[in-house]
């Protein structure tokens, strides 16, 4: 059974990941939990911090110090932190599950390079429902795409720092790929003022931030006389955490490579 470590274990998503690991993989469970260096929480029990009771795993402020205690690292931290962890895991031969969003093209290329040496699952969203939605969007785009105007609307809590969301961008990529378009050339991010008529082949993005919304995504295919909406709404971060743990367990015995949740769920 895979020994799992969680990076950023003191954060909102990190604590949810700790809980998800304990629920899904109690036999081996969480074997390491890492927080930022200098944190006042170093030494605390990860289970107690996640309101689970003691699980015997103390928070560490140094990934290298716990290198012998895990096989796969789940990392949802910010890009700069994640890339440092990626470099370490690549050198140490550790698998990774990465849910970091807001990556640049160059940073994604670093993931691809690391995937030559270690197995990595990278996804903008680990929800089973979202990844099924990507499959549906591919189908809808192939059937309706040339006849419909396509808009992607996403809503998240006030604390989210990147926009559009990684999930919205992944949805846009799925649609653009199905239509043979380059998303970087057809994406329109928000509109203001006298924009003129809508260009036919564009894919629009609208972003809403407020409250404690975990994540809502709607893709609109609007044509003459009808419209199709494909919507996914997440009500709990546990949805993403369970998917990440599923990916971590799936990586056992996998060859080096850069995988995504479509591989984990066999949705290709």
UniProtKB/Swiss-Prot annotation:
Broadest EC class assigned to this enzyme: oxidoreductase
Pfam family, one: DapB_N
Catalytic residues as annotated in Swiss-Prot or TrEMBL: 156, 160
Coiled-coil intervals: none
Binding site for NAD(+): 8-13, 99-101, 123-126
GO MF annotation list: 4-hydroxy-tetrahydrodipicolinate reductase; NAD binding; NADP binding; oxidoreductase activity, acting on CH or CH2 groups, NAD or NADP as acceptor
Annotated residues for binding of (S)-2,3,4,5-tetrahydrodipicolinate: 157, 166-167
Pathway named in the protein's UniProt entry: Amino-acid biosynthesis; L-lysine biosynthesis via DAP pathway; (S)-tetrahydrodipicolinate from L-aspartate: step 4/4
GO CC, one annotated term: cytosol
EC number(s) on file: 1.17.1.8
Catalytic activity: (S)-2,3,4,5-tetrahydrodipicolinate + NAD(+) + H2O = (2S,4S)-4-hydroxy-2,3,4,5-tetrahydrodipicolinate + NADH + H(+); (S)-2,3,4,5-tetrahydrodipicolinate + NADP(+) + H2O = (2S,4S)-4-hydroxy-2,3,4,5-tetrahydrodipicolinate + NADPH + H(+)
Principal location class: cytoplasm
Chain's role: Catalyzes the conversion of 4-hydroxy-tetrahydrodipicolinate (HTPA) to tetrahydrodipicolinate.
NCBIfam families attached to this UniProt entry: dapB
Name of this protein: 4-hydroxy-tetrahydrodipicolinate reductase
Organism: Pseudomonas fluorescens (strain SBW25)
Gene this protein is translated from: dapB
């Amino acid at each position: 059974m895979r020994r799992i470590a969680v990076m950023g274990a003191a954060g909102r998503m990190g604590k949810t990941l700790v809980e998800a690991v304990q629920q899904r993989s109690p036999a081996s469970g969480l074997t390491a939990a890492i927080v930022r260096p200098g944190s006042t929480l170093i030494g605390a029990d990860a289970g107690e911090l996640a309101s689970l009771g003691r699980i015997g795993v103390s928070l560490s402020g140094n990934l290298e110090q716990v290198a012998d205690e895990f096989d796969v690292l789940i990392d949802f931290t910010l890009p700069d932190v994640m890339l440092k962890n990626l470099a370490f895991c690549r050198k140490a031969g550790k698998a990774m599950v990465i849910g970091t969003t807001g990556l640049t093209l160059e940073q994604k290329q670093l993931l691809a390079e690391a995937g030559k040496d270690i197995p990595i699952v990278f996804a903008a969203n680990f929800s089973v429902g979202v990844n099924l939605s990507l499959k549906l969007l591919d189908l809808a785009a192939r059937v309706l795409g040339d006849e419909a105007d396509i808009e992607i609307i996403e809503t998240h809590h006030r604390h989210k720092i990147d926009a559009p969301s990684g999930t919205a961008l992944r949805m846009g990529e799925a649609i653009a790929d199905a239509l043979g378009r380059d998303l970087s050339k057809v994406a329109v991010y928000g509109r203001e003022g006298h924009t003129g008529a809508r260009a036919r082949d564009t894919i629009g993005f609208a972003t809403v931030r407020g409250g404690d919304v975990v994540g809502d995504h709607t893709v609109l295919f609007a044509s003459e006389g009808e419209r199709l909406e494909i919507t996914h709404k997440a009500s709990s971060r546990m949805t993403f955490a369970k998917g990440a743990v599923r990916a971590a367990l799936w990586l056992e015995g996998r060859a080096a490579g850069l995988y995504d949740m479509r591989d984990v769920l066999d949705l290709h």
